């Protein structure tokens, strides 16, 4: 097996135990392979009070534009109970056509394919290919994500680095390679409602004020009518209550307060501010003078965004169709990713492996998919430069 093969590269990365925040040797392996290929490689470490220091990697070959960035992360979630794995989570074993290991799908397999495609491209064209290729890789995507891509981009900008397009290799396909390109992501907003009552004995309700009916009234106000009907590239925004709690184990006490937490995944009809204002309007209308409540809104660093379909999106879609025989859907579904940071530096889209087993025991990827994804990335490079 060639050491340029995506399987060999993925196995080497999986064998690095890089559970966030540990680097585990994964970035060191990547840095070595890129520097041997002629890349200039740097390893900035970023810090934030109360969080662990995180190692990152920035590599570039070429000095001219256009600049295509491959982005991703080498950190992985914990493997859980190791004894439950059919093959060790950091073994990188192959069985029945599948590569097993934590990060096989999310997303060491994707990084291996990016690296393999780039090495093959440089073997074909040499270092003077009419542009630049950069790798932007963090060890802080699965964790707090405060010392990773967001700071790496600021660091690169301060050095005068400018990017034209970015391809993020997150696992975007639900079931089959080639199904889906992510061209945007929904925003996320978390809210906490507290309804204030007055504690008392259930036998004397006139001496108390039960907050629970009021909380149910407010919850109904947020869920009775849809927030919107969706937009051209986004489904309708969705509000889900995730917990309701009174902290009251007693059966004969009316609680003093009742609390609920909700999360909204919102589309590009909204910003965090406009959505927050709509939520507050609905709650105040439902509460009137009958329900005393407080609302704490916590916007994440995940606004809704959309990369408009353009020639770059078409190039990636063409490459996928050429290798898989299917035209990928352009989607904005799913959770958040580091694309939420990259969008401020350049247009970004996401395409990677099949995500069905990510974060699961026995996370695995079909070896054939590694080869096909490498070929897709190779076609993108050939079309881009």
From Swiss-Prot:
PROSITE patterns the UniProt entry points to: ARGE_DAPE_CPG2_2
The enzyme's first-digit EC class, named in words, is hydrolase
Task: Name the residues that bind Zn(2+) 2.
Answer: 106, 142, 359
Free-text comment on the cofactor: Binds 2 Zn(2+) or Co(2+) ions per subunit.
- Where along this sequence does the record place binding of Zn(2+) 1? 73, 106, 170
Q: Quote the CDD domains the UniProt record gives.
A: M20_DapE_proteobac
Q: Give the metabolic or biological pathway.
A: Amino-acid biosynthesis; L-lysine biosynthesis via DAP pathway; LL-2,6-diaminopimelate from (S)-tetrahydrodipicolinate (succinylase route): step 3/3
Q: Which UniProt keywords apply?
A: Amino-acid biosynthesis, Cobalt, Diaminopimelate biosynthesis, Hydrolase, Lysine biosynthesis, Metal-binding, Zinc
Enumerate the Gene Ontology biological process terms: diaminopimelate biosynthetic process; L-arginine biosynthetic process; lysine biosynthetic process via diaminopimelate
Q: Which reaction does it catalyse?
A: N-succinyl-(2S,6S)-2,6-diaminopimelate + H2O = (2S,6S)-2,6-diaminopimelate + succinate
Q: Which cofactor does it need?
A: Zn(2+); Co(2+)
Q: What is its EC number?
A: 3.5.1.18
What Pfam families has UniProt attached to this entry? M20_dimer, Peptidase_M20
Active site (catalytic residues): 75, 141 (proton acceptor)
Which InterPro entries does the UniProt entry name for this protein? ArgE/DapE_CS, Bact_exopeptidase_dim_dom, DapE_proteobac, Peptidase_M20, Peptidase_M20_dimer, Peptidase_M20A
Q: Which superkingdom is the protein from?
A: Bacteria
Q: Its family?
A: Belongs to the peptidase M20A family. DapE subfamily.
Q: What does this protein do?
A: Catalyzes the hydrolysis of N-succinyl-L,L-diaminopimelic acid (SDAP), forming succinate and LL-2,6-diaminopimelate (DAP), an intermediate involved in the bacterial biosynthesis of lysine and meso-diaminopimelic acid, an essential component of bacterial cell walls.
Protein name, as recorded: Succinyl-diaminopimelate desuccinylase
Question: What is the protein's species of origin?
Answer: Methylorubrum extorquens (strain PA1)
């Amino acid at each position: 097996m060639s050491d340029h093969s995506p399987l060999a590269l993925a196995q080497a990365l999986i064998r690095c135990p890089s559970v966030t925040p540990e680097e585990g040797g994964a970035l060191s392996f990547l840095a070595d392979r890129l520097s041997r290929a002629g890349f200039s490689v740097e390893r900035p470490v970023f810090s934030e009070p109360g969080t662990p220091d995180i190692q990152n990697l920035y590599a570039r070959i070429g000095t001219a534009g256009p600049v295509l960035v491959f982005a991703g992360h080498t950190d992985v979630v914990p493997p859980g109970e190791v004894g439950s794995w059919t093959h060790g989570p950091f073994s990188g074993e192959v069985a029945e056509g599948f590569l097993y290991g934590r990060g096989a799908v999310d997303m060491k397999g994707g990084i291996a394919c990016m690296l393999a495609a780039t090495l093959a491209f440089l073997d074909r064209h040499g270092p003077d290919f009419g542009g630049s290729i950069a790798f932007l890789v963090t060890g802080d995507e699965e964790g707090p994500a405060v010392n990773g891509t967001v700071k790496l981009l600021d660091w690169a900008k301060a050095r005068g680095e400018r990017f034209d397009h970015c391809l993020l290799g997150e696992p975007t396909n639900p079931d089959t390679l080639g199904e889906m390109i992510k061209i945007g992501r929904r925003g996320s907003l978390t809210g906490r409602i507290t309804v204030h009552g007055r504690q008392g004995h259930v036998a004397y309700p006139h001496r108390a004020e039960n907050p629970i009916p009021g909380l149910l009234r407010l919850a109904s106000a947020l869920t009775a009518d849809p927030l919107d009907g969706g937009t051209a590239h986004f489904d309708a925004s969705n509000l889900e209550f995730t917990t309701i709690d009174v902290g009251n184990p007693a059966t004969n006490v009316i609680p003093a307060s009742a609390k609920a937490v909700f999360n909204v995944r919102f589309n590009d009809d909204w910003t965090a501010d406009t959505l927050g204002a709509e939520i507050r309007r609905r709650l105040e209308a439902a509460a009137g003078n009958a329900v005393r409540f407080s609302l704490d809104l916590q916007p994440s660093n995940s606004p809704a965004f959309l990369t408009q379909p353009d020639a770059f999106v078409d190039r990636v879609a063409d490459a996928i169709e050429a290798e898989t025989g299917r035209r990928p859907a352009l989607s904005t579904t799913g959770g958040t990713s580091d694309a939420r940071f990259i969008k401020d530096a350049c247009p970004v889209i996401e395409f990677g492996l099949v995500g069905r087993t990510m974060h699961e025991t026995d996370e695995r990827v079909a070896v054939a998919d590694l080869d096909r994804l490498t070929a897709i990335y190779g076609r993108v490079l050939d079309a881009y430069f």
